[in-house]
Amino acid sequence: MPVLAGINSKVLKNGDSEPSPPPAGIYRIYNMRFCPWAQRALIYASVKNVPSEVINIHLKEKPDWYFSKHYKGQVPALELDEGKKHVIESAHIPEYLDDLFPESRILPSDPYEKVQQKLLLERLAAVAPAFYAAAQAANNPEGRDEKYAALVKAFEDAEKLLTGDFFSGKAKPGFADYLIFPNYQRVFWLSHILPNSPFSSESFPGPNFPKLAKWYRTLDSIPEVAAASQPTEMGVGFFNDYLKGTPNYDYGL
């Protein structure tokens, strides 16, 4: 089976039948095509070339059976061993895959380096709440400047933390790079929509962030990352609907 088979399948929702368990040797990822947290698992599986299939879930009308995969009904969830095992949460699944496939390990095995990558990811993750606040400001001018400023501050902090080509501190992307990329990609999509966006959609994120701009272009051009991503026009279209309160989880299909 190819990596990420079914990534663009239509969502399963309440009333839809539960799919048969994945066969032995196949890793199933429960996903939503535009969710940055689920995309972390997709990118990791893609980079590590894990034979996997993707089942997309409707996050407003979740199937009852899905709560047996993830007790909160969130994505991502990883299902394996013919449905006997489940691993949940966007940072735990990548680490689990590294332990399962150590020959293609991304997260360092050295305890100190491993902790440093996790701590760095926590610092970079400040972009996530700032993104959602700025997104809500798209249709509400009240407090917009403050929300934009908080998002810019998250980018300024990341620019300082990026001391080389990658947040891994090495010659190729690492754990923090792959897991934080989806959040920056969402800001890129949002830059096409926001009134008076503080970021450039042409040379994202813009001239004030030269290191991040190079980093983003590099990550975005990696084939395995692209395979786990939605095209820009799809992301922009989805978020246009999302900001109107009518998200279409099958947008573009």
From Swiss-Prot:
The keyword Transport does not apply. Residues 25-105 form the GST N-terminal domain. The gene is gsto-2. Residues 110-238 form the GST C-terminal domain. The keyword Oxidoreductase applies. Belongs to the GST superfamily. Omega family. Glutathione binds at residues 62, 75, 89-90. It comes from Caenorhabditis briggsae. GO terms for biological process: glutathione metabolic process. This is Probable glutathione transferase omega-2. Keywords: Oxidoreductase, Transferase. One of its GO terms (cellular component) is cytoplasm. Exhibits glutathione-dependent thiol transferase activity. Has dehydroascorbate reductase activity and may contribute to the recycling of ascorbic acid. Participates in the biotransformation of inorganic arsenic and reduces monomethylarsonic acid (MMA). It catalyses: RX + glutathione = an S-substituted glutathione + a halide anion + H(+); L-dehydroascorbate + 2 glutathione = glutathione disulfide + L-ascorbate; methylarsonate + 2 glutathione + H(+) = methylarsonous acid + glutathione disulfide + H2O. GO terms for molecular function: glutathione dehydrogenase (ascorbate) activity; glutathione transferase activity; methylarsonate reductase activity. InterPro entries: Glutathione-S-Trfase_C-like (IPR010987), Glutathione-S-Trfase_C_sf (IPR036282), Glutathione_S-Trfase (IPR040079), Glutathione_S-Trfase_N (IPR004045), GST_omega (IPR005442), GST_Omega/HSP26 (IPR050983), Thioredoxin-like_sf (IPR036249). Its EC number is 2.5.1.18, 1.8.5.1, 1.20.4.2. The active site is at residue 35.
